[in-house]
Amino acid sequence: MKVAALIVAAGRGSRAGPGAPKQYRLLAGQPVLRRTLAAFANHPEIMTVLTVIHPEDASAFEAASGGLPKLLEPVFGGSTRQDSVRAGLEALNADAPDLVLIHDGARPLISAPVISACIAALSTHEGAQAGLSLTDTIRRTDKGMAAETVARDTLWRAQTPQAFRFNAILDAHRQASGGEHTDDVSVALAAGVKVAMVEGDQDNIKITSAADIQQAERILMRSGETRTGLGYDVHRFGPGDYVWLCGVKVPHDAGLVGHSDADAGLHAITDAVLGAIGAGDIGRHFPPSDPKWKGAPSEIFLAHAAKLATEAGARVSNVDVTLICELPKIGPHADAMRARIADILGIEKGRVSVKATTTEGLGFTGRGEGLAAQAIVTLIIG
């Protein structure tokens, strides 16, 4: 049985406020759409994933989807959701899937069990829709005043995926051409296709506003696996009149000696990220014996580690780095360092701490021979 996923991501939703379309906004360090695509691309029963996008979003889609398996070339949507789904179905027709799951690109927290339940329902039904049976009391109103209670035993709150036998939903959309249906179950019902309801998931929310992104982040924090990594680095002082620390150029009466720019702070954070995902250390990825990295800015190393973390399904929750030295003074530069680290990792500055301490004159740092950095990074997987 060949199962395809059709992800509808051609909208321009204005409720999320100014900026990128909601499906390309960052959710805990990753674009919303990437999380949606990954949920289907990583599902063992899904064979292909086709995305319907807005013509202006080709570059954004490429950036958001890079490296994911099973993805077909996206197609452009139309002026309505119905038009966009029709375009996607016509494109999938050449691939001849048996089943198709149609899902909102702005629902990034769809779970594997709900996907599986929708597919399973198609063994006995032409269509299936995820949804939530209502538990709250439902009441009609009359001019703002409470009126009669509505029986809730037949009421569901609709979600996606909406899953169908492929030929049935393609024919239904062709029959509905020019109509104004708001979802695919409506299209199916109009064509006489019977659709079963499948219990969905409370966490399968649709991102329509900034508040929804905050709610989704809370859900991810609650449900994800926590990983912690520890990094430590040392560099000695040498000739120079500045040092690089945590991505910031700091004036000093000496420089730091190293193969790259000797930024001990970023090196420690890089090792912490790599350690949290079990990817070795900075030397494995950027060996000091390679002249390519001579004098290289250390932000390259941290950005690479962050990319590996993203590919492993992880996101950075927070970073805590301690710089150990007598001089230079870190306090005046700490805020700029926090901002630079946050920018490299694509997280909020409030998730980054930079602080300094001394060894009270003891050891090589106490003698002013060099400095050290220690970093702890917390990642959330899931």
From Swiss-Prot:
Q: The organism sits in which domain of life?
A: Bacteria
Q: Which species is listed as the source?
A: Parvibaculum lavamentivorans (strain DS-1 / DSM 13023 / NCIMB 13966)
Query: According to its UniProt entry, what is the function of this protein?
Result: Bifunctional enzyme that catalyzes the formation of 4-diphosphocytidyl-2-C-methyl-D-erythritol from CTP and 2-C-methyl-D-erythritol 4-phosphate (MEP) (IspD), and catalyzes the conversion of 4-diphosphocytidyl-2-C-methyl-D-erythritol 2-phosphate (CDP-ME2P) to 2-C-methyl-D-erythritol 2,4-cyclodiphosphate (ME-CPP) with a corresponding release of cytidine 5-monophosphate (CMP) (IspF).
The alphabetized list of GO BP terms reads: isopentenyl diphosphate biosynthetic process, methylerythritol 4-phosphate pathway; terpenoid biosynthetic process
Task: Identify the cofactor(s).
Answer: a divalent metal cation
Q: Which gene encodes it?
A: ispDF
| Binding site residues for a divalent metal cation | 233, 235, 267
Instruction: List residue numbers at the site (Transition state stabilizer).
Output: 15, 22, 259, 358
Query: Which parts of the sequence bind 4-CDP-2-C-methyl-D-erythritol 2-phosphate?
Result: 233-235, 259-260, 281-283, 357-360, 364, 367
What molecular function terms (GO) are annotated for this protein?
2-C-methyl-D-erythritol 2,4-cyclodiphosphate synthase activity; 2-C-methyl-D-erythritol 4-phosphate cytidylyltransferase activity; metal ion binding
Q: Where is this region: 2-C-methyl-D-erythritol 2,4-cyclodiphosphate synthase?
A: 227-382
Sorted keywords for this record are: Isoprene biosynthesis, Lyase, Metal-binding, Multifunctional enzyme, Nucleotidyltransferase, Transferase
State what protein this is by name: Bifunctional enzyme IspD/IspF
Q: Gene3D superfamilies given for it?
A: 2-C-methyl-D-erythritol 2,4-cyclodiphosphate synthase (3.30.1330.50), Spore Coat Polysaccharide Biosynthesis Protein SpsA, Chain A (3.90.550.10)
Which reaction equation describes what this protein catalyses? 2-C-methyl-D-erythritol 4-phosphate + CTP + H(+) = 4-CDP-2-C-methyl-D-erythritol + diphosphate; 4-CDP-2-C-methyl-D-erythritol 2-phosphate = 2-C-methyl-D-erythritol 2,4-cyclic diphosphate + CMP
